[in-house]
């Protein structure tokens, strides 16, 4: 793969591909269920503001609780609950996620969701997508360097 042609795939995805592949392969069935059900609580928390914009306050927790009404799989429920961590954590606050269980899965999921929802942000060329991608790129690089690269530049 020519990394230069992959402008919307962060470098960390290639740099840590063996670790990511091993972890994702090990939990493949659970990841599939997590990705299918991670927003299952959204219908129960939808709020439409005065401008017609849709909001889903606390949707990750509500989705976890909704999922647990139909499944006892706590592993998937925990991934659902933490689904927004990589979307809302600023790169400067990466240390709070370094030892988060299965942070690698959450980073990959956030990347997949960002690509899946690109049109909602105005497309891959939009400023909105670029900002979200840049934040996820920095966050993922800092987390994975801190966790796996003993000679990283983050000072950990």
Each language-model region and where it sits:
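Divalent metal-dependent catalytic cores for phosphoryl transfer on phosphate-bearing substrates
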Residues: 11-122
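Non-catalytic terminal/accessory segments
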Residues: 5-9
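Charged substrate- and nucleic-acid-binding regions of tRNA-handling and nucleotidyl-transfer enzymes
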Residues: 103-110, 114-156
């Amino acid at each position: 793969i020519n990394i230069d042609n992959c402008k919307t795939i962060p470098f960390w995805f290639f740099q840590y591909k063996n670790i990511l592949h091993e972890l994702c392969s090990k939990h493949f069935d659970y990841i599939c269920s997590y990705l299918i059900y991670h927003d299952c609580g959204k219908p129960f928390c939808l709020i439409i503001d005065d401008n017609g914009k849709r909001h889903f306050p606390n949707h990750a927790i509500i989705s976890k609780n909704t999922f647990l009404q139909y499944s006892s799989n706590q592993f998937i429920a925990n991934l659902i609950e933490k689904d927004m961590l990589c979307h809302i954590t600023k790169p400067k606050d990466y240390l709070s996620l370094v030892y988060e269980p299965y942070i690698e899965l959450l980073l990959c999921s956030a990347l997949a969701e960002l690509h899946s929802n690109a049109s909602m942000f105005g497309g891959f060329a939009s400023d909105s997508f670029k900002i979200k991608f840049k934040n996820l790129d920095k966050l993922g690089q800092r987390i994975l360097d801190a966790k796996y690269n003993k000679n990283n530049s983050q000072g950990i």
